Amino acid sequence: MKNTILILFTAFIALLGFFGMSAEALADLKADPLAGPNPDADPEAINLKAIAALAKKLLG
C-alpha cells in the first residue's frame, strides 16, 4: 500500500513538473531548453526537491 501511494505521488509530481516546464518554455521563447527552469520567469514554480524531501520524510 505504501509503495502504491509513493508511485502515484511520484507520477503526479512528474506530471506537474512536465506541464509546468512546458508552460514556462512557451512563455519564455528565448530560454535555453537545456538550461532548466528559470525561477525568475515563474515566481510560483513548484519546488520539486522540497516536495520530494517532504514525501520521503512522511513516507519513511
From Swiss-Prot:
GO terms for cellular component: extracellular region. One of its GO terms (molecular function) is toxin activity. It is found in: Secreted. Residues 1-25 form the signal peptide. AXPX repeats lie at residues 31-34, 35-38, 41-44. Residues 26-45 form a propeptide. GO terms for biological process: defense response to bacterium; defense response to fungus; innate immune response; killing of cells of another organism. Keywords: Amidation, Antibiotic, Antimicrobial, Fungicide, G-protein coupled receptor impairing toxin, Immunity, Innate immunity, Repeat, Secreted, Signal, Toxin. Its main location: secreted. The keyword Transferase does not apply. Expressed by the venom gland. Belongs to the MCD family. Mastoparan subfamily. This is Mastoparan-VT1. The lineage of its organism: Eukaryota, Metazoa, Ecdysozoa, Arthropoda, Hexapoda.
